């Protein structure tokens, strides 16, 4: 069917279809054409008796959109046909069906390009009173702000003074996306992930209706506003949550768990069960699987109420900490976006004997985060427990499955439940006095001395959490298999170590209790039963709110452009040091008339928006009109960036690009000065420094690193001795390693839990500064801090003690001690000296294992990850078998004699 076009019309694109007039379908051809510099849509109908031609000018009032699928949030079956709507200045809205979807989408893409080209040529037009656009414009305008959930009223603005950005979308009939969960409200930069079942958006759809750079932002903004108006479409429905915690002291289950898990007449909807000290064996630190995990998981499943059917939602374990989530089968369909995370707070975060595990999920439309933690032990270590809590909060973040969204931290959830062996004790040294008050049931007097209550009151830990009234006796410490208090020589003071806390609204605790019937461990299990109000979406009301938002956004997007104001654009970070955080803050304000989306974007040819030592928090988000947001610029030099800063290859200099969608870019200048550190400096360079690194000129540091690299290469090739050609003989080992090891040898051989207890952060920074600026007679800080400083030093080395070139040979020779020693003999001299020096020191430490509580397996596992690291290109491909060979390689020298 060859259409006849008006004289002078140049066809650009064409598609055949049907015009829908109620139940009738009439064949037609839609043609995009250009005539006399004006783009037009020509509609030609082919009925039985007539040939009708309509011409619709493509101007600022023209709309041509796809029905239903224009939501951008649903997918379309391949080549299934599509429907479009067309409306112009003088025409009613007309509906067409195009059987060939590919041709339709291509045609719509051409129309969109024509609209954009035409908008560049248009001058303000005199609006005709008969135009549908004019009729819309002269209606009483609602306050956009109220409809979108914002406080500002835009109705008084002079719209003619605003630049128009043509928006070809019309969204009043869109299908709404799944309701956003409220993480978006709590952290505006998070684009909440949708249900796994939800189809994805096609690239073709995105190109048709929104410029590529704006598609995701529009979707995100719609979700953001939906969240703000959440109260309009959700009902609060109560569900029963059972939360339990038990430190099982490495024991296996020896009785039914029903007295703990099935103690309420009505079965709960959700179970959250946490264990600590699940497995105390040395192997638990090094292997992913544990027999105890299987035993206790099965015991929990058998202990759940038989009145209801449950399904395991998630299990997560880190060494001895395990968290299980179960839900009634009829509720599982309402749980989505499940994610797990673990955080070790043992030394350097490598030893997971202490720390936390967590599960986050969305139940209906409420976000939950369940945390199970085991904090530092001993009465006097309450500050370390506080630090463990802060570390878990700071380091534990979740990535929502199958979505590229910013990570969500613990506190960005509607409801957080924190359970576990928190290990806070009573500030009462007299066990007999405590037991006397317990026998008199005067628990309220004891609770005044409870460390957790004291720390919460002082806002040093768990400040924003609630805890129910404790009316049960302390749950620690008992003789195993009995109800008797600890009768060992240590005679531990009873304490409420095992706790359950929560934060969030609509949370009502019904019971908080211990379960004395279970005697497996030296702790008693604890449980709490909650009624939690969960946001359940009313689909009809939700659809109405969604359509309302989209309709108003379509009008607003043509009327306003976004704008930001920054409080400052230049930043200088003075005296930046290794592992010492510096922060600078500034404010951004939305001084425009519409909500806006901002983000830091990579510069040309860069993959990240900033250098590795810099971070902006938040790095993206939404701002409402007149809203102000604080942004923190954080500079932190870690082991990953310290070497290139030490060598002068990089400087504290960067430029950040703050991008405003549909607006302009803002440029932030970052500057500063860095103080070099011995941490992250090569062993060769350190052996050539007789003075502290801060006293060495920067130019000399660069020369030392370059010379050291060349000589190390020669040494590996065994061409020349390491010190040949130098005027000054280098040190046998770096003075920094000698100072740390010598201190530990003199003062820490009898230190309990050496290399297993983290150091204090303030002391670690003092040690780093001390080694960088002086050659001290004594190292500041306690033994644990000095021990961790040694580990940090080894981890930060740009080339590990056993060079990357010999990594694979070490693994291959792990079965043969003779070959292992040959490989070590091929190391460059200073690397070989450091390795032998450390092995001699560790063998000496192992002689005092009865006092310091260390063993060869633990030491081999910890130090093999530092001394025998895989090359960067193999890091992600390291297998458990590789790690086992590395441990075996080190055991050859730990179990050998002093001559080794």
From Swiss-Prot:
Catalysed transformations (reactions): a 1,2-diacyl-sn-glycero-3-phospho-(1D-myo-inositol-4,5-bisphosphate) + H2O = a 1,2-diacyl-sn-glycero-3-phospho-(1D-myo-inositol 4-phosphate) + phosphate; a 1,2-diacyl-sn-glycero-3-phospho-(1D-myo-inositol-3,4,5-trisphosphate) + H2O = a 1,2-diacyl-sn-glycero-3-phospho-(1D-myo-inositol-3,4-bisphosphate) + phosphate; 1D-myo-inositol 1,3,4,5-tetrakisphosphate + H2O = 1D-myo-inositol 1,3,4-trisphosphate + phosphate; 1D-myo-inositol 1,4,5-trisphosphate + H2O = 1D-myo-inositol 1,4-bisphosphate + phosphate
Gene Ontology molecular-function annotations: GTPase activator activity; inositol phosphate phosphatase activity; inositol-1,3,4,5-tetrakisphosphate 5-phosphatase activity; inositol-1,4,5-trisphosphate 5-phosphatase activity; phosphatidylinositol-3,4,5-trisphosphate 5-phosphatase activity; phosphatidylinositol-4,5-bisphosphate 5-phosphatase activity; small GTPase binding
CDD domains for this protein: INPP5c_INPP5B, PH_OCRL1, RhoGAP_OCRL1
Start and end residues of each stretch annotated as 5-phosphatase: 236-562
InterPro entries: Endo/exonu/phosph_ase_sf, Ig-like_fold, IP5, IPPc, OCRL-1_2_ASH, OCRL1/INPP5B_INPP5c, OCRL1_PH, OCRL_clath-bd
Family stated for the protein in its record: Belongs to the inositol 1,4,5-trisphosphate 5-phosphatase type II family.
Subunit structure and binding partners: Interacts with APPL1, PHETA1/SES1 and PHETA2/SES2; APPL1-binding and PHETA1-binding are mutually exclusive. Interacts with clathrin heavy chain. Interacts with several Rab GTPases (in their GTP-bound forms), at least RAB1B, RAB5A, RAB6A, RAB8A, RAB31 and RAB35; these interactions may play a dual role in targeting OCRL to the specific membranes and stimulating the phosphatase activitye. Interaction with RAB8A modulates OCRL recruitment to cilia. Interacts with RAB31. Interacts with INPP5F.
Name of the protein in its database record: Inositol polyphosphate 5-phosphatase OCRL
Organism: Mus musculus (Mouse)
Gene (name only): Ocrl
